[in-house]
């Protein structure tokens, strides 16, 4: 069962993988823009409740962390304009190589459900 899931997700990553704009990957640029705007932050959750938005711990911006099964993420705080929070998910042992981007509407729980790594960011148009 696990092998089939990983194989399917690998195919999904291969099909949706795309290069990110260099400014998104630049930690200093993105962090300074986020600080100036102050329009939300990404939350990494276990047992995320979509009704209350409750969650176990907050993930810092532009930080590479390993995540396990049934880990959820959401965007909360000052994001009442309907903008999405996005996370980049890498396949492998760190935030390098092939990746895909997943986005989640503000204050909504979105299930990643993978054993891959994540590095969070918020798009700054």
From Swiss-Prot:
InterPro entries: G_crystallin-like, Yeast-kill-tox, Yeast_kill_tox_sf
UniProt-annotated location(s): Secreted
Secretion signal, residue range per the UniProt entry: 1-19
Temperature note: Thermostable.
Disulfide bond annotation, renumbered to this chain: 45-55, 48-109, 64-95, 86-103, 104-110
Pfam family, any one: Yeast-kill-tox
pH effects: Stable over a wide pH range.
GO MF terms, alphabetically ordered: toxin activity
Chain residues in the propeptide: 20-37
One cellular component term from this protein's GO annotations in UniProt: extracellular region
Alphabetical keyword list: Cleavage on pair of basic residues, Disulfide bond, Secreted, Signal, Toxin
Function comment: This toxin kills sensitive strains of yeast. It inhibits beta-1,3-glucan synthesis.
Self-association state and partner proteins as the record states: Monomer.
Name of this chain's protein: Killer toxin HM-1
Originating organism: Cyberlindnera mrakii (Yeast)
Gene: HMK
């Amino acid at each position: 069962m696990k092998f089939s899931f990983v194989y399917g997700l690998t195919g999904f990553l291969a099909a949706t993988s795309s290069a990110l704009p260099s400014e998104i990957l630049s930690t200093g640029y993105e962090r300074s823009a986020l600080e100036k705007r102050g329009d939300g932050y990404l939350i990494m959750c276990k047992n995320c409740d979509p009704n209350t938005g409750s969650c176990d711990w907050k993930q810092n911006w532009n930080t590479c962390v390993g995540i396990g099964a049934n880990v959820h993420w959401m965007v909360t705080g000052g994001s009442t304009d309907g903008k999405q929070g996005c996370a980049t998910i890498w396949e492998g042992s760190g935030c390098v190589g092939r990746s895909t981007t997943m986005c989640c509407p503000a204050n909504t729980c979105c299930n990643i459900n993978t054993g891959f790594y994540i590095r969070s960011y918020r798009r700054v148009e």
